[in-house]
Amino acid sequence: MGHYVSTQVPDKHFIVNQGFCPRHDTVDPDYVETVQAAHPKALFLAHPECRKEVLALADYVGSTSGIIDYAGASDAKEFIIGTEGGVFYELETRNPDKVFYPAMEDAYCINMKKVTLEKVRDCLRDETNEVFVDDHVAGKAVRALERMLELAK
């Protein structure tokens, strides 16, 4: 995602971590082109964590909520979705008249599926899995979160 953000703000210098999302990294440009050939009217909506070769094929690049909003506002009836498969439920619920195709063979992230409402409830109720950080780090994190919320307004 750092690479994508740096292309959107070219006047800024970014120091980008060399990490990646294992799910978005598996979106293969050749597979996307195969799906595009099978569904030529479909728009390809990609998450910015996909590789740049994949993003180059996209009609729209945006966050999960951006993809959901774009599909809802678009007049198009078919979409290829380049992000985690959990988004399909929301897309199909909001847009029953539209068709969505995955941009990867296995679109589900096993790590995201480990978090359930029951597990969150249990952690909050039982006060387990608490994370401790030193005050210096916590202060910086709070400022970053407050700024993020401010920008979202």
Named regions from a protein language model:
Residues 1-153:
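The feature marks the mature, well-folded catalytic cores of soluble enzymes
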